[in-house]
Structure formats: C-alpha cells, structure tokens
Amino acid sequence: MWETRALELNNQDIWNWSSVCNLVRYASQHGFNTIVVGQADLFGKLVSPKGYTPFHYNDSVSSQQRARCVYLNRLAMYCREQGLRFYLQAKELGFPTELLLSHKYLLDNQQGILFDVDFWSRWLTDKIRGVCQGIPALTGLIIALSSTDGLLPITRPKWDINARDEPENARQPSQSFVLYRRCFQALSQVVSAQNKHLVLRVFPASNDDLGTVLDAIEPLPPTVSVSIKLTPERFWPAFPNNPALLQVTLRDVWVDIDLAGEEVGWGVMPFLRIDELKGRLLWCQSANPRITGAICKTSWESVDNHWIPETLSECNLFACSQLLGHGAGKTQEQLLDLWLAERYGWCPRCFSRPPFSAATGAGNGAALPGDLRPRSRFSPP
C-alpha cells in the first residue's frame, strides 16, 4: 500500500462547500488518506504580506482573504475529523500590481521584471508564513516555483523566447541554480518553522531547467518531499514514464497522475486507462523505492463545475484507489466489475452477454433488470 494516497481538486469548486465535502467523502470511501485543494494563484487570494506597499490595509481585500482562510481551515479540520491529511497547492511567484508600483526598481527595461533574489525570497517567506498562520489546521503545502502560470518564472520555455531576444539576456543554468536554491531554502525554512510539511512540485516553465531544479532541491532537509508528473509533459498514453522520477533518491517522491484527461476531452467520453496506470504504478514502485505517494487529480483547473466522478472515466480513478491500496493484484476486468457494481449496482457476470454490449442494449434487445442510472454516493437511493 502506498503511504500517501491523495485526491486533488483544483478548480473553482474548491470554494463550494458541498463540492469539497463530496471530495472528502469520496476519499474516505475509497481508501485515500490525503486531500489536496489548489489553484495557480491560491496563496495570493489568502494573504497580502505587510510592509511591501503603502496600502497597509484594504478592508474589502482583507475581509475576503480572511474569509477564505477561515473557510479552508474549516475544511482542514473536517478532513482531520475524517482521518485525512490536508494540503494546499499553488504556483509561485505571484504578486499584485501595486507591489511593482511601490518597488519600481524591479521593472527592468530589458528583462521585464527584475529577479532580485533577496527581495523575492523575502516576499515568498512572508507570504507562506501568513498562509500557515491563517490556516493552522493544514498539514502542508505543495508549491511549484517558476511554472508557466507564475508571474515571475526563473527561466522561460523555448516557445516564449522569440528571435529578437538577446542571447546575453538568457539566464544560464548556473544563474538559475542560485535563484532556485535561495527560494527553495526560504520555503523550506519558513514551512519547517510553522511545523508544516513542504512538498516541492517539480514543474519548471522550461523543461531544460528540470535538472537545475532537482540539483537545487538536493541540499534541502530530507523532510522536504517532491512531486513529479507521471509523464514528462502533460499526458498521452504513448508518452514514456517520467525519467525524473528516478533521479530523486534522498527524499520521498509523490507522483502526479492526471485523471481529468486534459488531452482527451476531460473525461467526457470514456477513456479506459486501467492497464496503463497499473503498469506505470508498478514501474514506479520497482524503479525507485522513494516513490511513496501519488496525487490523483480529479479536475482540471481551467474547467469549472466538472470532476471525474461525474464521468464514465471515473473507472480510472476508482482503479487508482484500488491499485494504490490493497487491490494492486486485481486485473482490469476485476476492477471494472467492482466499479460497475458500485457506480451502477450492476454485476456484469450476472448476464451471459459481454458487459459493454449489455450496457448498450446490444444483442437480442432484451431489457436489463434494475435501474442502470448512476447511483449517487452522497445521497440515499
């Protein structure tokens, strides 16, 4: 059984109490032990570090931020009552516009925003401290630094560099290493001081920076974990397993599993991945014993009011819950049978015809007994 079995929700539904309660109940019913909620700019919605702008107090913004912290702390306490750990996930660095207006030297004509590592590591420290203090019941934070969604990436992806860029303005790996190391050290120290668990998500804006990021993480205390995607970039069945998963041997590794199907219609159409997922998870465990956790993403941050348990592709999420727990030895057929029985109250082996032809009414046209409409797990039949 995997040590960390996490369920993640990362769209606007995290602010809907009914939706997050459904997430918690789903996790409890299916053997998950960790809840992750997140958005790219989440931390900026929760706190505004003091002393960086002349606008020390904005009643509207402050009230909204405080309300969100109270809400998430309530969710963290609910998770604790259900025996679940609770993490927040976000992408940094992010900041409000007035920060640049108050520190105009950060605006560089050649490179856009100046990466003053002393300033930004201090800003990051104060922001993360505020998040931990505002939501004391949380277990830890999952942070991606310098992703394409951050306002201040340390390096840019190749597609974002045009022919007019001067070569001398491109940041070299040795320079990037120093920036990553300083920021990671700042994150590690502040999260540890708040008695929380830090998970660094290896998700740089440029894939060329992957080795630099891993090198900068290596000197950190072993209590800092890392999160790495199952495939090198996005998801497609033919993509290889991510070799970066094998490069971390001094700390726990959590593998990111995209079950929302960004590249295949977000799970709207059935997309069977059970055998593929089983093979990849077995590879993880055999290839690197430090891979101890998995984060199953149930949504995609750009599509609201949608998550995998409301689609036919839920079979993949259900299979993951089994494969990460005590069902690792089950076959795809057995896992599908279990899912159909739970979701539809239907046992395919009770019928002589094949499961999917029966489900579609193929064959002799005889009606199937019972109601095959999906049963809600969260309300009585």
Language model features: what each stretch is:
Residues 212-256, 267, 279, 285-286, ...:
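Extended ligand-binding clefts on enzyme/binding-domain cores
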Residues 287, 292-293, 297:
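Extended, compositionally biased alpha-helical segments that mediate assembly or anchoring
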